[in-house]
Amino acid sequence: LRAGTMDEIIDRKTAICDLPRHPNCGLSIDHHKSNEPHENTIENSIILWEPTPSAARIAYNLLKNKIDLSDLSETMIWVDKLDGGSISIDEFKGNNPVLWLGRVIGESEENTTTILENIQNRVSIEEILELPDIKLELRERMAKQEYLNRTIRENLSIIDRLAIVRLENLK
């Protein structure tokens, strides 16, 4: 956004969430202190900023009394942990379905659409992860994650409480 590569498609009908405000957007939702609005508001633009753990929490809180979002309440806990940086290493390395969904969404446009349509239809995350194409993507991502964990373990040294992972000799 800052580089201007999307300027021609951002207009007053564009909503931007969890990214720096764009002068052309109509709705900006953010929680980062660095993006807190002050006097420099944008004319004809709605800016929703709150000091919440995640930008998604702002949207969730705004809509939860207007539409039933109860099926997302558990997911929001994990979204807050991830976006707010309050997730522990053990939680991050764990097998929580929300985390695995987050790791596979966006890998392909087709699977992303399938995931979003199923969430919209209130299909549980566990059921979504069992869909054949999603399950295949998940298996590949789990194997990749194990490879990354093993590579880090094998190349990690701690010197004066500083963790150093040497990756320059990897093939």
Tell me what each language-model feature is:
Residues 1, 84-171:
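Hydrophobic helix-and-loop "lid/oligomerization" segment in the mid-to-C-terminal part
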